Amino acid sequence: MNVTIYDVAREASVSMATVSRVVNGNPNVKPSTRKKVLETIERLGYRPNAVARGLASKKTTTVGVIIPDISNIFYAELARGIEDIATMYKYNIILSNSDQNQDKELHLLNNMLGKQVDGIIFMSGNVTEEHVEELKKSPVPVVLAASIESTNQIPSVTIDYEQAAFDAVQSLIDSGHKNIAFVSGTLEEPINHAKKVKGYKRALTESGLPVRDSYIVEGDYTYDSGIEAVEKLLEEDEKPTAIFVGTDEMALGVIHGAQDRGLNVPNDLEIIGFDNTRLSTMVRPQLTSVVQPMYDIGAVAMRLLTKYMNKETVDSSIVQLPHRIEFRQSTK
């Protein structure tokens, strides 16, 4: 049977209000009374109900995190950053997996609010106008992590994805490549069509190189789609000599697909990935990759959310963290 605040009050011979003050750390309790209540709580095994406490304090010290795919290394690292900062500031986490499904994302958002969370960290590859309208209506603060929305109405923590793509392609151009392909994630997602593709094209254009539509191949973030993409690119009359890939997992597929065709990476084909996940060091040759600081994005997003929840001063609601390229053996 669950022990209630009433049971604690009765056993300790104090009022329920006194038990509540002790549980919530209110200093207006005599030390002897506090000691007696805490001993009773320990003896009975009482566990305060966060939601019930929230009804009184209007805070549950709980944060909702909506994540597209917890099995993905990228999002798992983000979640670690979120949780570490949440723990530091004494918040609990409710984590929900949306499977990158818009209807499920909106359902989870409303579900989180029903649990009376104090704030929400939201991640999605495709933040639509409908998302923005729902997020704006949220009664608690919301911060986007590694997710973009074009209006900048929702606070967010990201990197400059367009510039990161530009830098990756520019490094291949600087190595002498003229035939550079791009294997993208799902093109309907703004992070790809509005950012990474734009950076890829800008690097080529500014260097006076042609932009070939056939050199832009859409994948679905999986290893298999990387294999399929490189097979398609190697059918081109003028084959690419370098490929920029939108994620590390697809890049592994590109490397293995090229090797299956008898090509040597990097002598015949140089490859750069994106995200610098652990996968980049698990392949041979090891993968050169754009470093997106996943843990830091999660940590900074959680810290930004704590500022909003506690009504602290926020210098900027749109935070962009620095990126860099980690050069390994898939490039010369």
Swiss-Prot record:
PROSITE patterns: HTH_LACI_1, HTH_LACI_2
Ranges of residues in domain HTH lacI-type: 1-57
Coiled-coil portions: none
DNA-binding region ranges: 5-24
Keyword Isomerase attributed: no
This protein's UniProt keywords: Activator, DNA-binding, Repressor, Transcription, Transcription regulation
GO molecular function: DNA-binding transcription factor activity; transcription cis-regulatory region binding
Superkingdom as given in the UniProt entry: Bacteria
Pfam hit, one: LacI
General function of this protein: Global transcriptional regulator of carbon catabolite repression (CCR) and carbon catabolite activation (CCA), which ensures optimal energy usage under diverse conditions.
NCBIfam families named in the record: ccpA
Name of the protein described by the UniProt record: Catabolite control protein A
Source organism: Priestia megaterium
